């Protein structure tokens, strides 16, 4: 059999809400989202021993705490219905803390002490194509602590984008292996069996056996792996009995996604919280929530819970071509440190609009850009402030 490759063009990302911090979750096709790019980065303390050994070489390293980071960039995609969350709903919810849905829209509102977490999975889903194979990596105990929305000339080829960044407890992977030799009939009620190559799996791996044995439809979740004996443990009931040689592959279900891109040519920026429009070139709005993970206590090899480490930061920047009648509106108010009720609409159609609201926004001091050729420009940046608490930023899909 050929040693198949993994096709990077066929990536799907899935997000699932964890019931217990750091305990990986199974998934369904409705947990999927389309992405532009993403990265899952594992980390573990591995350093050389500091004691002297009588040699000029380092002889050993020690292992410490594990962690992971992630970044997911995707198009800003309203679902197409004002009462339905977008595909990346769990990422928005985890970053902001609160979700409100009514007959006019889906709204993400900041919260103080939300501490729930996610399992994120990046899958290469090939469908058994010739010369290629499925693969999956995951992070568990993940939280989103930074969101960056880009639109206009700051977006992707004129399309609005959103980037989610965060930290996680641990990283893992799901490769391809098979049921080990010596099995004639593994019962559907079994919770362990040996695999031929245990290093293809890790804690939190999600697999199916052959094409139909999916543990009830959401994949079979690996609880533990013994890399010496090859025994894996799981909790799901098998859909059918197993025997040696049956192939184990990552469980990457068909994605169910929705939404249409929002282009830079549609939308408005208002500095007074209404529909009064001021022309701009594009902008970027960033939320840094400053939640982190507790990964310091004795007795743990990775993070054990979510903690708030500091106050959040909401910032934004927008580019303008400087016009005669707008000097006072931009430079005059900036110089006086006037607060603004800033509203950014990306899109303008029902069911296809994202509204970003910062009701107390103050500009920073910024230099003008006056080139030898072309028109004078200014990039205005500033900070969103809270008024009554947890209201420095709101995002609505209308």
What are these model-predicted stretches?
Residues 1-398:
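Signature of extracytoplasmic/envelope-associated structural regions
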């Amino acid at each position: 059999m050929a040693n198949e490759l993994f096709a990077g063009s066929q990536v799907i990302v899935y997000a699932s809400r964890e019931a217990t911090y750091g305990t990986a979750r199974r998934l369904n096709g409705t947990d999927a989202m389309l992405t532009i790019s993403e990265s899952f980065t594992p980390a573990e303390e591995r350093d050389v021993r500091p004691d002297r050994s009588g040699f000029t070489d380092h002889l050993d390293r020690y292992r410490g705490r594990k962690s992971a980071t992630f970044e997911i960039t995707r198009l800003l995609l309203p679902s197409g219905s004002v009462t339905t969350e977008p595909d990346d709903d769990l990422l928005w919810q985890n970053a902001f803390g609160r979700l409100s849905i009514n007959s006019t829209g889906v709204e993400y509102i900041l919260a103080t002490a939300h501490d729930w977490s996610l399992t994120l999975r990046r899958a290469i889903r090939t469908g058994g194509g010739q010369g290629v194979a499925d693969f999956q990596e995951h992070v568990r105990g993940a939280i989103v602590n930074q969101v960056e929305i880009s639109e206009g000339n700051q977006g992707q080829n004129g399309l609005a984008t959103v980037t989610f960044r965060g930290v996680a407890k641990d990283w893992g992977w799901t490769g391809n292996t098979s049921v080990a030799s010596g099995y004639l009939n593994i019962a559907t009620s079994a919770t362990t069996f040996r695999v031929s190559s245990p290093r293809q799996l890790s804690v939190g791996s999600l697999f199916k056996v052959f094409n139909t044995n999916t543990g009830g439809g959401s994949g079979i979740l690996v609880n533990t792996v013994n890399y010496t004996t090859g025994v894996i443990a799981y909790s799901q009931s098998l859909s059918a009995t197993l025997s040696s040689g049956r192939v184990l592959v990552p469980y990457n279900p068909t994605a169910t996604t929705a939404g249409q891109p929002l282009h830079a040519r549609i939308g408005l920026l208002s500095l007074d919280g209404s529909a009064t429009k001021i022309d701009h070139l594009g902008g970027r709005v960033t939320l840094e929530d400053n939640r982190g993970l507790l990964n310091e206590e004795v007795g743990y090899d990775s993070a054990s819970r979510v903690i708030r480490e500091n106050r959040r930061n909401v910032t934004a920047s927008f580019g303008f071509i400087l016009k005669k009648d707008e000097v006072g509106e931009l430079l005059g108010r900036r110089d006086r440190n006037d607060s603004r009720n800033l509203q950014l609409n990306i899109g303008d159609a029902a069911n296809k609009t994202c509204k970003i609201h910062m009701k107390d926004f103050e500009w920073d001091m910024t230099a003008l850009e006056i080139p030898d050729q072309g028109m004078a420009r200014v990039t205005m940046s500033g900070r969103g402030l809270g008024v009554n608490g947890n209201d420095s930023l709101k995002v609505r899909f209308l």
